[in-house]
Design a protein with these regions (language model features):
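C-terminal regulatory/oligomerization modules of transcriptional regulators
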Residues: 1-4, 126-151
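Alpha-helical linker/hinge and terminal dimerization helices associated
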Residues: 16, 20-23, 27, 61, ...
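Basic amphipathic alpha-helical segments that dock to polyanions
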Residues: 43, 57, 72-78
Length: 151
């Protein structure tokens, strides 16, 4: 008898990802962060990578270029990020930087949401979290070899 899809690791990963996204949205709304979870992700990435081209940012935050552009438009309107045009390999690219205001916003939001995430994290053994992370990385590597995924 064939295994039902809802009993597979792939379904469990997708379901967990949806739970994480919903949890993130609820936490950001509950603590009145003033930005979305996706916008915070952008600020967090940029806070740790001072200058990044928009295309590389899109890959890291797992969004297409159009959605990344919309997120950046929203953040730029509030002076959390700035974009400048540059040339890379003879092609125009947009370089994104977090502003001081954006860095402050990311820090403020982290202070608001951190207790909630720590509460969830405390319920899971750290070695189990590391093990699951390693297994997921291994699974992605196998799928990358098998499917030639281009993200």
């Amino acid at each position: 008898m064939q295994e039902h899809f809802t009993n597979t690791i792939f379904y469990q990963i997708e379901l967990t990802a949806k739970y994480c996204k919903l949890l993130g949205s609820q936490v950001f709304e509950k603590y009145e962060a003033g930005i979305t979870c996706e916008e915070y992700t952008v600020l967090d990435v940029l806070a740790n990578s001072p200058k990044m081209c928009q295309r590389d940012l899109a890959k890291i935050i797992l969004k297409d270029r159009a959605n990344t552009g919309k997120l950046l438009d929203s953040l730029e309107k509030r002076s959390y990020v700035s974009r400048t045009l540059s040339i890379k390999n003879n092609r125009p690219v947009k370089i994104v930087e977090i502003t001081d205001e954006g860095r402050k916003k990311a820090e403020d939001v982290l202070e608001k949401i951190k207790p909630h995430y720590l509460h969830v994290k405390e319920k899971i053994n750290n070695s189990d979290v590391a093990r699951v992370g390693d297994l997921l990385k291994e699974l992605r590597e196998i799928m990358d070899e098998t499917l030639e995924i281009q993200i």
